[in-house]
């Protein structure tokens, strides 16, 4: 029976008694025996992190090294495009299947290849994450060259799920902006999603003009002109506009081509690791015998550093509760990494980029039902402080962009008010936050009380939204200047 001893250990116990236990050579061979068509990883590859890149063959064989977001208005084809490229249906929850829309962040990996013999766009192919590194071209029989291994972060487009979209934006390296050609452009969440990724300093945006199978050529040209006018003056002004039908996989090769030509993100492999948790779950099926229980799993992405199988890690903030006086108290979690996976691919280590599942030796109850969403994982004692409040240099948008008619009769975004409650996105978590102080010459330095507390890094970009009706609407962004009370 698994004993979840790490829950009861203090930081001193972990650092004093528990050490990293790397797997043996025999264990490594056993780990990779199920996927012999992929590269065998070795700790020697990462012994000098300054010499590795996101395109290092041993890394790219098993792990995605870029995160691509799919953004845009509801029902414009984001999930369908991800399925057309990766072969994976990202809507897996019951409510999503019943209503045929995305409610939660969806995830899928894809390997992107080029055939050295096939002409033009026909040379570009996409397969699942478990495909071998040099498969034969189905058209000509030549061996394909692996160019990229990417993870899709499929964001919901419904207006009431804007906070979920912002959580996904925190881990994106680039974005596909889906625009349905059979609707007037822009739609409300087309505007709002583009504004969100711009605020998060995302530079690489590809515009995809979807559903061209539903309209005639003249209508497609008119919609194209609307898209050009909409993108003018934004970070997407020079972005390619790719006409496709995701449903029929028409011109998908063009999307793959542009994905393969995105700039390689600059990664920090040297600093202590910082892993952003965007989901957590219990992988045990109901009725599993106690001796067969597996520990909890967290999923997310590394923004810097490297994590290895067998390492001791800390999760902050861990268990959050309130004392008798109503004040928040936090018990950070410590555990050993017992598995690293990306979809079905086993990993010996994980590097920045791509979505990773980290198996831990903690009670699976703690990770069930997304209980650890928004947490940070890393080496003990190396993570940012937990703050009960933060001070932010704010930048307000001039108007609400996520409401109907915002282009013609847009509502002005009013100034932030004392005691107002806004929704702040810090990393991958959304926090209801009360304004407790406003200062600065332009009244743009705001202190927020976080409820509950969260990890934040000085200089980190945060987004904030205001409640309008039943939905949170994006109103601005800012940089964390300082933390307030630590916990």
Language model feature labels by segment:
Residues 2-36:
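Long, basic/Gly/Ser/Thr-rich N-terminal segments
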Residues 31, 67-70, 214-217, 363-487:
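C-terminal effector modules of nucleic-acid-centric enzymes and ribosome-associated factors
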Residues 44, 52, 62-87, 148-153, ...:
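Helix-rich terminal scaffold detector
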Residues 148-149, 155-160, 170-192, 202-221:
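Conserved Switch II/interswitch segment of TRAFAC-class P-loop GTPases
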């Amino acid at each position: 029976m698994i004993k979840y001893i790490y829950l009861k250990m203090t930081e001193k116990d972990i650092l004093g008694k528990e050490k990293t236990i790397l797997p043996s050579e025999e264990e490594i061979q056993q780990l990779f025996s199920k996927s012999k068509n992929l590269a065998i990883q070795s700790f020697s590859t990462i012994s000098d992190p300054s010499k590795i890149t996101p395109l290092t063959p041993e890394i790219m064989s098993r792990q995605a090294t870029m995160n691509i977001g799919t953004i845009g208005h509801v029902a414009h084809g984001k999930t369908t495009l991800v399925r057309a490229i990766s072969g994976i249906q990202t809507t897996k929850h019951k409510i999503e299947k019943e209503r045929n829309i995305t409610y939660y962040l969806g995830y899928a990996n894809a390997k992107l290849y080029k055939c050295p013999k096939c002409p033009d766009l026909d040379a570009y192919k996409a397969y699942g994450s478990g495909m071998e590194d040099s498969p034969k071209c189905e058209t000509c029989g030549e061996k394909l060259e692996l160019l990229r291994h990417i993870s899709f972060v499929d964001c919901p487009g419904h207006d009431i799920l804007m906070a979920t979209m912002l959580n996904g934006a925190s881990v994106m390296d680039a974005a596909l902006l889906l625009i349905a050609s059979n609707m007037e452009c822009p739609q409300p969440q087309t505007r709002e999603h583009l504004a969100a990724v711009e605020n998060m300093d995302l530079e690489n945006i590809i515009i995809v003009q979807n559903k061209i199978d539903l309209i005639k050529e003249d209508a497609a040209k008119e919609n194209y002109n609307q898209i050009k006018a909409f993108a003018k003056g934004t970070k997407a002004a020079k972005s390619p506009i790719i006409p496709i039908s995701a449903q029929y996989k028409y011109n998908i090769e063009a999307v793959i081509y542009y994905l393969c030509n995105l700039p390689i993100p600059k990664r920090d492999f040297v600093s202590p690791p910082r892993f952003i948790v965007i989901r957590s779950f219990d992988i045990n099926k109901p009725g599993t015998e106690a001796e067969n229980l597996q520990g909890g799993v967290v999923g997310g992405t590394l923004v810097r550093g490297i994590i290895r199988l067998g390492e001791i890690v800390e999760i902050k903030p861990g268990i959050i509760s309130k004392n008798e006086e109503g004040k928040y108290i936090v018990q950070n979690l410590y555990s050993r990494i017992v598995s690293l996976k990306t979809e079905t691919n086993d990993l010996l280590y994980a590097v920045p980029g791509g979505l990773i599942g980290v198996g831990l030796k903690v009670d699976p109850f703690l990770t069930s039902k997304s209980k650890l969403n928004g947490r940070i994982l890393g080496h003990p004692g190396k993570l940012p402080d937990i703050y009960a409040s933060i001070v932010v240099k704010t930048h307000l948008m001039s108007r609400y962009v996520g409401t109907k008619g915002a282009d013609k009769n847009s509502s002005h975004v009013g100034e932030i008010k004392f005691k107002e409650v806004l929704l702040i996105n810090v990393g991958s978590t959304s926090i209801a936050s009360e304004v407790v102080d406003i200062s600065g010459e332009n009244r743009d330095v705001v202190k927020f009380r976080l409820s509950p507390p969260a990890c934040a890094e000085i200089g980190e970009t945060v987004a904030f939204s205001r409640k309008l009706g039943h939905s949170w609407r994006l109103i601005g962004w800012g940089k964390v200047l300082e933390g307030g009370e630590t916990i």
